[in-house]
Regions:
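Mature, well-folded catalytic/scaffold domains that follow N-terminal targeting or propeptide regions
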Residues: 153, 157-158, 173-183
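Structured binding/interaction patches within domain cores
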Residues: 2-164
Length: 183
């Protein structure tokens, strides 16, 4: 794929051109995980152009929106709606990376104002997904936060972690399959 499709950020584009991307990427979130499934996911995500990767991350975050609790459902929905609009504008190249980052900071209020740990990390799944429209590296962090939520929901349940990773992989394969048909 062309470097400009792979990454919109110059640093990530240069890493792609010089082939210095290493998988698996280091964890940025402390989680109990199936590292083989995570690597499998990353290998698929690596083949998606950034626009599709961002769409994948946002779609992957949808199941976690209902877990976000900031004590004010109206405010939560307003923040999510505004952030979605900024994300879509960025994908249409109508928003600069800076404007998207500002929207991401607003979305981060969902995490800061969370009423419990599950709500906090569910919000981070969403915030990192939105940020994928700025930098690719946020996609795997979003996916890892999804695993963090599953860790909190059921302590010591590796099967729940595997199910979540398999769901992420199926969704990524769907996006990869759709990308092939676009060409």
């Amino acid at each position: 794929m062309k470097p400009e499709d792979y990454a919109w950020n110059e640093f990530e584009r240069t890493s792609y051109k010089t082939k210095i991307n290493r998988l698996p990427s280091p964890y940025k979130v402390a989680i109990w995980d199936d590292s083989e499934k995570r690597l499998e996911l990353e290998q698929i995500l690596e083949r998606l152009p950034q626009k599709e990767l961002a769409r994948w991350a946002l779609e992957n975050s949808r199941d976690f929106l209902s877990l976000i609790d900031i004590g004010d459902e109206g405010e939560k929905n307003k923040i999510i709606r505004q952030t979605y609009e900024a994300f879509d504008a960025r994908l249409r190249n109508e928003f600069s990376p800076h404007e998207l980052r500002k929207a991401g900071f607003t979305a981060n209020l969902l995490s800061k104002n969370a009423q419990n740990q599950i709500a906090k990390y569910a919000a981070r799944v969403f915030v990192q997904a939105i940020s994928t429209a700025h930098m690719r590296g946020h996609a795997i962090v979003s996916a890892d936060y999804a695993i963090k939520v599953r860790n909190l929901q059921e302590v010591d349940k590796l099967e729940l972690v595997r199910q979540e990773r398999e769901k992420q992989i199926r969704l990524a394969e769907f996006f990869l399959g759709n990308e092939k048909y676009k060409r």
